[in-house]
């Protein structure tokens, strides 16, 4: 009889211990009620949407809603989303309540490449290739004889320069590369082509071009010349 009483007391103690554990740790019994998805930089990039994030998680059987909070693996969520070529960084965490937060930072393109060899892709701020997909943002387009190595070593610095300068970001809409690797710029304002030659000392060349715009074209008109050559230092050659 004493042994039975001891056994009952032991079972009761274990039960009470588990009950206290569950009570003090609501995650064990609580289920996820909502997933809050935040996609940063949506105003300047539109490669991925919150709906697409949710779809990826559902297809991977990782969608948290309805799952016990204790069973939700945020590290696995981040791992799966990191495979998407348009995502740069992911942070996922559980709240003290019943929500899961997923914050995604998109890769930001600086240029679209449409090469004569058939390549069609974007390059991001780090110079990494991004596959061509639906995207409507106003980016400079580079055309012509462009290999991936040329795009990374020569065009990426130009793309960054244009992207982070408000004037040039608004002014230049296309870059063309000829078979010798020489570069032409096509502006939005002005009926002319800007020839810069080999893509070296581009910062200095654009500085001279900007001064020429202000001091000359503002006086004679932006459609005065059909070609503006800024290849060589200390001179600008114009053709009507």
Show the residue positions of the predicted features:
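N-terminal membrane-targeting segments
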Residues: 1-67
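Flexible glycine-/small-residue-rich
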Residues: 39-41, 104-108, 134, 143-144, ...
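Periplasmic/extracytosolic POTRA-like scaffold domains at the N-termini of outer-membrane
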Residues: 42-83, 131-160, 197, 207, ...
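Short beta-strands and strand-coil junctions in structured, solvent-facing domains, enriched
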Residues: 44, 88-89, 99, 108-111, ...
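Short, well-structured beta-strand/strand-turn elements
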Residues: 82-98
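Extracytoplasmic segments of membrane-associated envelope/inner-membrane machinery
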Residues: 103-179
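Extracytoplasmic/luminal low-complexity segments enriched in Pro/Gly and acidic/polar residues
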Residues: 196-240
């Amino acid at each position: 009889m004493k042994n039975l009483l001891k056994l009952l007391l032991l079972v009761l103690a274990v039960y009470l211990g588990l009950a206290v554990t569950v009570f003090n740790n609501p995650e064990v019994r609580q289920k996820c009620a909502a997933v809050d998805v935040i996609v940063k930089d949506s105003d300047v990039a539109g490669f991925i949407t919150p709906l697409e994030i949710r779809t990826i998680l559902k297809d991977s059987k990782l969608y948290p809603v309805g799952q016990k909070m204790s069973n939700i693996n945020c590290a696995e969520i981040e791992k799966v989303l990191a495979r998407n070529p348009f995502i740069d960084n992911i942070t996922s965490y559980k709240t003290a309540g019943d929500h899961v937060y997923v914050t995604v930072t998109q890769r930001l393109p600086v240029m679209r490449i449409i090469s004569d060899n058939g390549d069609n892709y974007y390059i991001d701020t780090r110079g990494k290739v991004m596959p061509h997909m639906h995207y409507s943002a106003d980016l400079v387009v580079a055309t012509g004889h462009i290999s991936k190595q040329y795009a990374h070593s020569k065009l990426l610095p130009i793309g960054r320069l244009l992207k982070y300068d408000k004037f040039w970001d608004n002014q230049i809409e296309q870059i063309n590369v000829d078979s010798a690797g020489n570069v032409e710029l096509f502006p939005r304002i002005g009926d002319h082509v800007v020839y810069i030659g080999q893509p070296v000392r581009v910062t200095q060349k654009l500085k001279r071009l900007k001064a020429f715009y202000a001091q000359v074209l503002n006086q004679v008109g932006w459609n005065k010349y059909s070609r503006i050559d800024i290849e060589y230092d200390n001179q600008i050659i114009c053709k009507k």
